[in-house]
UniProtKB/Swiss-Prot annotation:
One of its GO terms (cellular component) is plasma membrane. Found in functional membrane microdomains (FMM) that may be equivalent to eukaryotic membrane rafts. FMMs are highly dynamic and increase in number as cells age. Flotillins are thought to be important factors in membrane fluidity. It holds the Pfam family FloA. Homooligomerizes. This is Flotillin-like protein FloA. It comes from the Bacteria.
Amino acid sequence: MPVDLGLIILLGVIFIALAVLFTFVPVGLWISALAAGVKIGIFELVGMRLRRVIPRRVVEPLIKAVKAGLDLSTSKLEGHYLAGGNVDRVVNALIAAQRANIDLSFERCAAIDLAGRDVLQAVQMSVNPKVIETPFIAGVAMDGIEVKAKARITVRANIDRLVGGAGEETVIARVGEGIVSTIGSSDDHKKVLENPDTISQTVLKKGLDAGTAFEILSIDIADIDIGKNIGAGLQTDQAEADKKIAQAKAEERRAMAVAKEQEMRAKVEEMRAKVVEAEAEVPMALSDALRKGNMGVMDYLNYQNVMADTDMRDSISKATGDQEADEKNDR
């Protein structure tokens, strides 16, 4: 009975040891590496575990690299993994570059990957150029007609400028700027419609791929259309603005004229008041002149006759004026 218990304990210890071994040490992965001809020790895999590296993320790309004939070491791949890179994508990019006869070292490829670029896509774009389609870009010719153009840009990745080079947005913006300036320098929008290739040729000569991660191979105008008559719209807006300014100035002059008229009316009333005041003093002056003997009775009577004649003339002229006005109205 004690022998059986000891055997059971021994078997349990062996089972636990094997479970820990197969859990902590990827024996299956080690066997796969040996079968693929990759020289890697079991203790190297244990060291990866201790360094918190997932062995499969390093060993499987290493197997692919060795089978593709690449000279890569475990330490390089492990270092790239610890730096936060994508080891599998880097190895795939190196294999694709080797097949396409592109000179690309592991250090360069790892730097591109750590910079946040998709290095595999970049290698594929170096072999198979990518077409970038811009939205409709509007420009105004010198005759005031708006012209809208859509372009297709064929680019190839420039691996040497992937780190620090501008992306697709910069290429689209520069091409759009070139299209706008080319349309704007045209004397007539009809010339742009007749020869749209002049836009692509002019833009392509400007070297818009400088400082970008791409090499522009061609720029083709995919579609071109006529927009609004911007020149006529601007002239209409200017005429409307001039009209409003003239109306404002006329209103200002009218207000000044009304104010001047009111001022003159006030002056007329003021003068009339002075006349009435002066006329009120006339009887007093006559009375004083008669009292002091400065004026005789005959002089006073002559004065009365003159005033009567004046009133009569005023009445006659007023009646004549009213009659002429009635005759004009009858006509």
